[in-house]
From Swiss-Prot:
Catalytic residues in the record: 2 (proton acceptor)
The keyword Cytoplasm is annotated on this UniProt entry: yes
Superkingdom of the source species: Bacteria
Family the UniProt entry places it in: Belongs to the 4-oxalocrotonate tautomerase family. PptA subfamily.
Any one GO CC term of the record: cytoplasm
Localization (cell): Cytoplasm
Enzyme class: isomerase
Alphabetical keyword list: Cytoplasm, Isomerase
Protein name (Swiss-Prot/TrEMBL): Tautomerase PptA
Record's signal peptide: none
Gene: pptA
GO molecular function terms listed in the Swiss-Prot or TrEMBL record: intramolecular oxidoreductase activity, interconverting keto- and enol-groups
Known partners and oligomeric status: Homodimer.
Amino acid sequence: MPHIDVKHFPRNLSEEEKKVIAEDLAAVLKKHFGSSDDSLSVAFNEIQPDRWKDEVYDPIIKPHLDTLAKKPGYSY
């Protein structure tokens, strides 16, 4: 049951753009995990740039730097 939680700076994405991105992300998981479409979910969460460190980097990224499959090229 993969769930993808995309946290990002505000982009003013339309519902259609979100749908296309979600379908693309789901296709990757279907290909590499063998997941069915019904088992996948995707969320989009806009985070203001001035809140990124407190809401994303410090609680989610920093504690898992050693195990991230793709590490960011920035730090705080």
